Amino acid sequence: MADGRASSAQSGENLLFLTDEQLRQGIEAMFFAYRGFTADPDRILSDMAYGRAHHRAVHFINRAPGTTVNNLLNILGVTKQSLNRVLRTLIEDGLVESKVGKADKRERHLFLTEEGHALEQKLSDAQRVRMRMAYREAGPDAVAGFRRVLEAMMDREMRNAYGRLKDSGT
Amino acid sequence: MADGRASSAQSGENLLFLTDEQLRQGIEAMFFAYRGFTADPDRILSDMAYGRAHHRAVHFINRAPGTTVNNLLNILGVTKQSLNRVLRTLIEDGLVESKVGKADKRERHLFLTEEGHALEQKLSDAQRVRMRMAYREAGPDAVAGFRRVLEAMMDREMRNAYGRLKDSGT
DNA sequence: TTGGAATGTCAACAACACTGACATATGCTG
DNA sequence: CAGCATATGTCAGTGTTGTTGACATTCCAA
């Protein structure tokens, strides 16, 4: 199983495809690529009092304005205490606004302020530059495959969340 | 630039391909997929005194037995203090062996013990299960594209490290 | 022999996650 | 209205992983 042969019975067409070696290369590619993926925003954030967690919060609030805390919690997959620490600083610093819900006053709806939008732009611009280069270098067919594999790699709930966001974006 | 149109001048063929919206979907796919990617090993590790950093160390020592601390440092992209804390516990617990170099006695060459191999197997088995399912679901062409985009997303040094590991694996 | 490289270690600190407990306000249901 | 559930916020404690900075040891090479 660890000697380079296929690690499970495969039909002939797959014997040369799903070897442990091929899978391990994919695993390592994910590891190295994710480092690159986060490197640029991380560099920007390290000059401020913010970190990757702030980036994620700002990204998804921008993506789904008016989202509730609970919804954000589900998307980010962290505890409310962890998210709250991040949201508190963002609200204190005037990047995020929290509005009491109209229908249900227990809920808080989150919005980016102008300043919050500015940060989001700065971070996502940096991340898009790399993404655009990678997409252009690899070509449209590769991008389609890239997306298909990533989707298949997600947990079910994350795939659902991803689908909802994808559909909401025009 | 944030209104959904392509964010940089593109030739016609790319106007429908590299919109900010498409790029953002790719960014979110990476985020959600990476969560799935690490979920299974993380679950296993949380039952021990180990974390993701231990997994990474064990993975690359297994991949390149006899690697030096410095080499591992470059691959993992962390400080020696951070790596050392992880290596120390792995050595203390008898999962990793550190051998003084023959040619250069300053160097330490790292190897997995039997117990270390057992943990590596357990972790990478879990990770491969998900990878294999994703690969199978997406198909060979998608996988090729997946790998091409990921490679294009890496920093140069990481792409080099990745290439060396890839070539070393038969 | 001296300088520098490789390694290891100590201390302090920060970011980010977790659990557990508790408070507050609100909504819903009987 | 009473009681329970939900949504949010907060406090305290803890763990993992990363960082800087400082310093010691060992050893190679000029």
Residues covered by each model-derived region:
Chain A
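Charged, amphipathic alpha-helical coiled-coil/dimerization segments
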Residues: 2-14, 38, 88-151
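Hydrophobic/aromatic-rich alpha-helical bundle segments in the mid-to-C-terminal region
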Residues: 18-20, 131-141, 161-169
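Flexible interhelical turns and helix-capping residues at alpha-helix boundaries
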Residues: 34, 65, 76, 80, ...
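N-terminal helix-turn-helix DNA-binding core of bacterial DNA-binding proteins
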Residues: 39-82, 93
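Exposed, interaction-prone assembly regions rather than primary DNA-binding/catalytic cores
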Residues: 144-170
